[in-house]
Amino acid sequence: MGCHSSKSTTVAAESQKLEEEREGREPGLETGTQAADCKDAPLKDGTPEPKS
């Protein structure tokens, strides 16, 4: 029983570290790229965004 709880804590801590490292390396790269893609999509297509 004790092993299970300590394992969960370790896994949670490792997951948090990974997330923090990712955010630290690329502060807003992924978000910025996604936002740019969304904005460019209708322009590249040649069709204006529907305003309904």
From Swiss-Prot:
This is CHD9 neighbor protein. Residues 1-52 are annotated as: Disordered. It comes from the Eukaryota. Residues 1-13 have a biased composition (Polar residues). Residues 16-28, 37-52 have a biased composition (Basic and acidic residues).
